[in-house]
Amino acid sequence: MVSFESSFERGTDFLNRNFKKCLFACISIFIFALLALSFLSLLQPDTVQRLYQCAVPSMIYVPPMINEAISIQHEEFNNRRRRLSAALREDKLDALIMEPTVSMDYFANITTGSWGLSERPFLGIIFSDDEPYPGDVASRIYFLVPKFELPRAKELVGKNIDAKYITWDEDENPYQVLYDRLGPLKLMIDGTVRNFIAQGLQYAGFTTFGVSPRVASLREIKSPAEVDIMSRVNIATVAAIRSVQPCIKPGITEKELAEVINMLFVYGGLPVQESPIVLFGERAAMPHGGPSNRRLKKSEFVLMDVGTTLFGYHSDCTRTVLPHGQKMTERMEKLWNLVYDAQTAGIQMLSHLSNTSCAEVDLAARKVIKDAGYGEYFIHRLGHGLGLEEHEQTYLNPANKGTPVQKGNVFTVEPGIYIPDEIGIRIEDAVLASDVPILLTNFRAKSPYEP
């Protein structure tokens, strides 16, 4: 007869053996399930990838358009330096001095991207076309450069400019070296020159002046080559917005949508934007708010203010859209149409070139919104100049009464209504002032469903 104790022990051994097997089987199944889910997640794209895959087919025409763009050519840079030299003569100054920022980009095709700013000054000097500096000013440009950087500077400047180089050793004062070489000149200091450099030039003995309106205005009138570049990059920008709009669904976050727009720029052969403005619902009442993890709700406006660059020239475009299948309230539709009508009024003013001031353009658009009772919610200027800088002279604001609109100016026209904690709407296009204003975005928005 088997004792109770031995039966219990055999039963316990059986349970222990089978428990271990069951536990091992459960763990194996759990691990397999995790691996299967991970594999399925790889097969199923995340929100950003799904949105990108939905939008990118509509961008197919953008890469060829960008690839066919032609950069600013050598002769245009020569003409720019000639115009600068003539302006310096008019201002009775000897030269403009600049760092590798936007002005050196404009006059010599050298940018911060190709020569980063540091504590060691690398300066470009373009002279007046007056005596005692005779000859073709188009090629007469000096560069102050650290001696050990001279080969790099020559490679960067290239052979198209007959430049002169003034070098300084590490144990020398670069500003004194420049003064000893050039003498007591009257220098116009470019507005982007850093303060310690401006002070160094003054202490060395140069007489310095700020940038005159005459010189500052040289970049305001865009050449046909500039207009072509800016048109291409603005068309590409609005193409990204139009491509993604039908794909937007409630539940996406502002950051996810901003990431997709940058992915579309890269697909088009363009650089990403560091700070895109993508805002949903009431958050769009902050004109320059940044994207957050806020998720899109049903029947909310989506404001996208985005841009990129081509050969250094900026685009800037804003659309306030509604995802397909979502419905507007009467108030949303009324406010969107009001902003659209204000933009229409502003654009139309850019054809009145004889005696229209920048202030009048702003006030024409502002009047539309004010007359409808929403003037207090249009809280910024109508627009700004656009070019090698995203915001550059001149500005469409009510105080700019003394600056006329000129043929060849490129402005953004971007009225908006911003009601705190409720709604924000802005529509923006880049426009070339002309007898018939030219949209550099090619098409205006037609509705929140057709950006």
Curated annotation (Swiss-Prot):
Pfam families: Peptidase_M24 (PF00557). Its cofactor is Mn(2+). It comes from the Eukaryota. Mn(2+) 1 binds at D316, H384, E414, E428. One of its GO terms (molecular function) is dipeptidase activity. InterPro entries: Creatin/AminoP/Spt16_N, Creatinase/aminopeptidase-like, Pept_M24, Peptidase_M24B, Peptidase_M24B_aminopep-P_CS. Mn(2+) 2 binds at D305, D316, E428. Its EC number is 3.4.-.-. Binds 2 manganese ions per subunit. Signal peptide: none annotated. It is an enzyme of class 3 (hydrolase). GO terms for biological process: proteolysis. SUPFAM superfamilies: Creatinase/aminopeptidase, Creatinase/prolidase N-terminal domain. Keywords: Hydrolase, Manganese, Metal-binding. Disulfide bonds: none annotated. GO terms for cellular component: endoplasmic reticulum; Golgi apparatus. Belongs to the peptidase M24B family. This is Uncharacterized peptidase C18A7.01.
